[in-house]
């Protein structure tokens, strides 16, 4: 393995993971079908870079005499959910992201790999797929070499129309958020893709199973996909079943299941005895690094006051949870809200026992989310429905509004010359409602009211700090400094890019948040820092366009030119989005246009607007929101603890600029169905962390120790899937 070029990702656990995956896949290539491996690192540990480094080093291994003829480029396919296209594109093309690891790859053996990673094509739909010139081989139209960043939905929805993707001889395939596959070989198109390519396949997921461990068995099928090359997909499925239903694995899982219900000393002995053999068995197909989470949990009451309940809430026993709730830290319903809840629950009980049964749990969750959402349901339109309070009096909406106001009041008072305002991320759930009446929309309207109050407070603060004359002077100083950077370093801007950026900066310089954060008088260092950021972005764009002018490809010159232009446009849009957000509160949900979502996401990762991002399930996976965010608010709970893990992982990940733990707030209505959900979720959380946990602690955070993992008696039984 030493003959291949190695990459230093900067963190020992990442290097250990990708090198283990590379060695495992290369050794299989010498024996038979390559198949795949699951990279299941905890949320925020850098699976994207591990996968890219694995692919790059595997391909350089092939260049060292493994292939009869050296190739100028390779075929790499990256399948990602639609909402993650922008994130992956940034990682692949921005100079300070993954490309920096390949800068010195100039030898004959590494140049082909470097050029492949530079030759990025984005496949958003069938139109963009048809744009790429293919060539005929074995009567099939195949794609030319390059790295194809592709929406995963194309494979499933387009069927035979996407035959170019399935018939291209891929050297490597990366599938992000692979837990959505569940049973990939049940999908004919995915089955075709894996069965016709003996590609090194990497499946990325922090949560290999959601509610049932059997889902892990489904994903394991994809790691044996190479056995379907002969057309015998049943062989791939059979080998996955052999692994998942291995006698030791079955006995281990059954013992753990009994431990969570009626624990006995015998079950503990069984699990402890089988822990190492089962870990060794699974490590050939799945590897996982874990870290100590940097989180502090709070319960919020009806006044919006948060009370800390420790970093180990989800590892607590049911008795401890009951004691915590009894202490009065959750949301207490007022008399009107409590009466409405009891009457609706009685109505639902009658309907549940009637001829046309209704689902009690879903209806109660809708009621506890917002009254507006509940009124739009079939039950909510019932003639027997009791009178509900007005929307503005919903206990959760009142609580979250007061909480947000309190958070930013503290943030504003703690703002110093060397720090920034720490932002808040609010997660909501549709709970079966139509998108037009979704919780995120209703909460968004309510939160915008809070944002309006916050804006007024900021404007009053501006008037106090800056009299009108001085305010105009401060705005002018900020604008002059940023426009000077454009004049000195904006030579790469083409067409109308320069005036567009200048116009955006004129609006940006006069906003209250900008004056508060970049005031040359109050925070002189902040403006200099922002000038450096803009200068670096413009220089990166200049380097990209200079490289674009110097590079050439005789066979695919027109195609390569189109792809490089696309990369340059993406870099410019990234610069533009930093300064173009106006709303202090923004939404990231399915009802928001993709372009607007991308703008909000990029703005949230800057010190400026938006300060609050309200996200639905669309925003709980795959995106990075960690740079300036320190507050995560769970407006609704989920039955699935893996979803909460994914939510909090948007912020608890490497790359945070802010120091200290993340504050996680739970809104739970006392004496309601929320309490039931919390108990169920805690039990499932234990099962999830024991089956996929390990004892390798990667980070040490002040105030957070190893005891913030699962209870010690269960952690001693947890599988260790860390790479060796």
Question: Model features per residue range: what roles?
Answer:
Residues 225, 660-661:
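Glycine- and acidic-residue-rich phosphate-binding/metal-coordinating active-site segment common to enzymes
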Residues 215-218, 624-637, 663-666:
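A short beta-strand element within the Helicase C-terminal
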Residues 160-161, 628-630, 647-648:
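Amphipathic helical hotspot of TIR/SEFIR-family domains
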Residues 640-660:
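Conserved SF2 helicase motif VI
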Residues 69, 626, 659-660:
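Short, flexible turn/loop "capping" segments at secondary-structure junctions
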Residues 1-24, 29-175, 179-200, 204-207, ...:
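Helicase motor interdomain insertion/brace
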